Amino acid sequence: SDSLQKTLQEERSEQTRLTKERRERQLTAAKLNRELASQTMTLKRLQNDEKRLGSLVASLQRKEAEAQKAAQRRAAAAAKRSGKQTKTASVPAPQKALVSTGPRMNPVPGKVVARFGEKRTVSGKTDRWQGTVFSVTRDEGVHAVRDGKVVFADYLRGYGNLIILDHGAGYFTVYGNNATLEKDIGDKVKAGDVISRAGKNEGAVSVLYFELRHNGKPIDPTG
C-alpha cells in the first residue's frame, strides 16, 4: 500500500541520515586523533594534564566545603550571641537529576566527536577519554548545563582557557578549550547561561572539551 511504501521510504531515509552522521563523526574523530598525534604530545603528557585537572577539582571541592563549614560556624556564633537558635545548613542530597533526567548535558549544539570512555590513541598508545569532545564554531556560546557557581576561570595547560562550575553535592562540570571566558570566579549561573566562547585550540579542528565529575571522579554525563 501507499502508506507502507511511505513508511519504508522514511525508514530508509532515516537510516541514510544516521549512517551519514556516524561517518562524519568518525572522520572528525580521526582528524582530531591525527592532530593529537602530530603535535608534540605524548599520552603521558595528556595523562599528566588530566591528573593536574583532577587535583585542581579536588582542591576546589575542599575549598568549597571549608567555606561552607566556616559560614555555618559564623552563623551559629552570631545566633548564639543574639540568643537565637539557628539551623545548621544541611549538605544537599546527591543530585541524581544532574545526570539522569532533564535535558541532555550538551553545553553546545555541535556534534560529539569523542565520547566519555571511548578509546583515544596518541602516538600509537591508547587509553580512554575522561570527558566528551564537541565540534564547535569559533566564538559560539558555551552554556552551563545546570545551575551552579563559577569556582575556576583561568588558563590550565592542556585545557586552554578553562571554566569550572560547582553544582553542589560533589558535582562539578568542566569546560575547556575556550576562546574567551564570560564569567568570573564567584559568579552564580543558571542552566543555559553563556559562560564562555568556544574555539581556542592549536589545531585546525575547533573543539570544546566537557567533563562531569562527582566527588573528584570523572563520570559519564549521559548516566
Question: Locations of the language-model features?
Answer:
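Alpha-helical oligomerization segments with coiled-coil/rod-like character
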Residues: 1-92
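A generic local structural motif
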Residues: 4, 98-99, 196-197
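Long, low-complexity intrinsically disordered segments
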Residues: 91-96, 110
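Long low-complexity, Ser/Thr/Pro- and charged-rich intrinsically disordered regions
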Residues: 96-99, 141
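Catalytic cores of peptidoglycan-degrading enzymes
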Residues: 104-223
